[in-house]
């Protein structure tokens, strides 16, 4: 198997700049020369503070926005191409499920948007609700769901068409500790089944608990890549800087 076939995501010198200000005379660089290789069959974490460029990179990989420079491939195809997009399951940050839907009708709705037949959706939905721990709650309206339950339903939506790659944007953000643990358990189960998962988070602890490899992004620049074990060992020897604010 070639190196490219063993990778689900590969970027080479990807940059993204935006024009802003009057007449677009000023520019802002959201990503600067990012080169990344994400192996198949792992939970790979993209770690960085808010505003680091994590979501920008995900949107480039999904074809939502265009890169300014560099090359990016997903599952062996150009990022954003139809061949790549149809094989990706995506859970965006702060996704919104129509509140009048139940888990069952929500999966029908999102499956139909993906072009799935109703018979194919119904063949998968109960199995997925079992996986994400919502079996028995499938006929309740999502308006009564907790944030953690909504995120787990979002995971089921992302897996509905049996994608080769699952992309998650801040999947545990705003979720209570119990809900975070439930989401981690689902993701670990998926990884044990051989799924490839690429997620971003600004929470170091979440990355440590679930990911096998990590890339650290800050101010649009890739600072470090490696295994989580290597990262935590490096952080253990790093100096601690504290900043106090107040009156």
Question: What are these model-predicted stretches?
Answer:
Residues 166-170:
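Catalytic Walker B motif of ABC-type/P-loop ATPase nucleotide-binding domains
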Residues 183-247:
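ABC transporter nucleotide-binding domain
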Residues 49-53:
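Walker A (P-loop) phosphate-binding loop of ABC-type ATPase nucleotide-binding domains
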Residues 108, 112, 119-137:
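Conserved ABC ATPase "signature" region
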Residues 70-84:
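Conserved ABC transporter NBD signature motif
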Residues 162:
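Conserved catalytic motifs of ABC-family nucleotide-binding domains
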Residues 2-9, 17-33:
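A short, flexible loop at the N-terminus of ABC-type nucleotide-binding domains that lies
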């Amino acid at each position: 198997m070639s190196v490219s076939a063993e990778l689900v995501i590969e970027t080479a010198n990807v940059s993204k700049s935006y024009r802003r200000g009057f007449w677009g005379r000023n520019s802002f660089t959201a990503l600067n020369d990012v080169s990344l290789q994400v192996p198949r069959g792992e939970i790979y974490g993209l770690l960085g503070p808010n505003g680091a460029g994590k979501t920008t990179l995900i949107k480039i990989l999904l074809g939502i926005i265009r890169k300014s420079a560099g090359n990016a491939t997903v599952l062996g195809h150009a990022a954003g191409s139809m061949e790549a997009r149809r094989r990706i399951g995506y859970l965006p940050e702060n996704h919104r499920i129509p509140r009048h839907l139940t888990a069952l009708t929500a999966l029908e709705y999102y499956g139909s948007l993906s072009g799935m037949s109703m018979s194919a959706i119904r063949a998968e939905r109960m199995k997925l609700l079992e996986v994400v721990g919502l079996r028995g709650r499938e006929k309740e309206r999502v308006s009564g769901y907790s944030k953690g339950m909504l995120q787990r339903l979002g995971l089921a939506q992302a897996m509905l068409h049996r994608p080769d790659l699952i992309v998650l944007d801040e999947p545990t953000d705003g979720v209570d500790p119990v809900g975070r643990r439930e989401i981690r358990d689902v993701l670990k189960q998926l990884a044990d089944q051989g799924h490839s998962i690429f997620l971003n988070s600004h929470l170091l602890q979440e990355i440590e608990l679930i990911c096998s490899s990590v890339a650290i992004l800050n101010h649009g620049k890739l600072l470090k890549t490696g295994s989580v074990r290597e990262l935590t060992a490096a952080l253990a020897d790093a100096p601690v800087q504290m900043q106090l604010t107040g009156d």
